[in-house]
Amino acid sequence: WIGYKEGMVDLPYWAVVNLLRGILSPVCRIEVRGTREVPAGPWILACNHLSHFDPPLIAGAFSLPIDFLAMRELFQPAWFGFLMRSCRVIPVGRKQADTTALKTALDRLRSGRIVGVFPEGGLRAGKTSVLEGAPLTEGVSLLASRSGCPVRPAVIVGSDQLYVARNWLRRPRVVVAIGKPLHAPLRGQDRKEWMARLAEEMRSLFGEVKRAHRLEEVVLPKTPQERWKSGR
């Protein structure tokens, strides 16, 4: 049982994470790289986003709780929103700057938490993904500069294979890896330049994962539509 030392506030989080790990572990092989050695918060986790399976797979790869940001639409219906908030998930609007979400995330960091963000702005693969050269959204740089907390780049590869039901029978590989921390932007520093550096760190980590884990072509990121069309 992971997370038993974290206190009462995280009991719902670990109950859900361990339940989902129990469901997903029989249908995929989860490989981790560096996730068990990370320090306690405050810091920010910035990861690419391939599929709806990413949050539980990422959470299950770490031995510390992560307070993820998730789009507000996922908090409906009301009972599911209650479950999400019980797991410390922070709702965020995507159409305009969400000052409430920013304040909540800053408060979590001040209290020593780890905040997880998907700075691509949604599910991305191919040319729209940071892993293939696309830019990141500005939210992560704003959160880092306001909090002064370091950002650790992370990469998940293979989770998109789970969109094809028959893949569950062959237990596809899913890799979750984390890189070295990147210091928050300094006051007056060009945030776009800082985001470009973070994006490059994520791409470099992706390259390391491909080499170290000898990933086959079928494991490399695809859109859900590409997965459904190929049946793999």
Question: Can you say where each PLM-predicted feature lies in the sequence?
Answer:
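A transmembrane-helix-recognition feature enriched in membrane-embedded lipid enzymes
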Residues: 1-37, 57, 78-87
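A generic secondary-structure micro-motif detector
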Residues: 9, 31, 69-70, 94-95, ...
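A structural micro-motif
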Residues: 28-30, 64-66, 87, 113, ...
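Short gly/ser/thr-rich secondary-structure transition/capping motifs
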Residues: 25-32, 96-99, 157-160
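Catalytic core of membrane glycerolipid acyltransferases/transacylases, capturing the structured
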Residues: 37-96
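Short, basic, glycine/proline-bearing loop/turn elements
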Residues: 19-20, 86-92, 122-127
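Non-catalytic C-terminal accessory region of glycerolipid acyltransferases
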Residues: 3-12, 100-232
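A secondary-structure boundary/capping signal
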Residues: 34, 70-71, 88, 118-119, ...
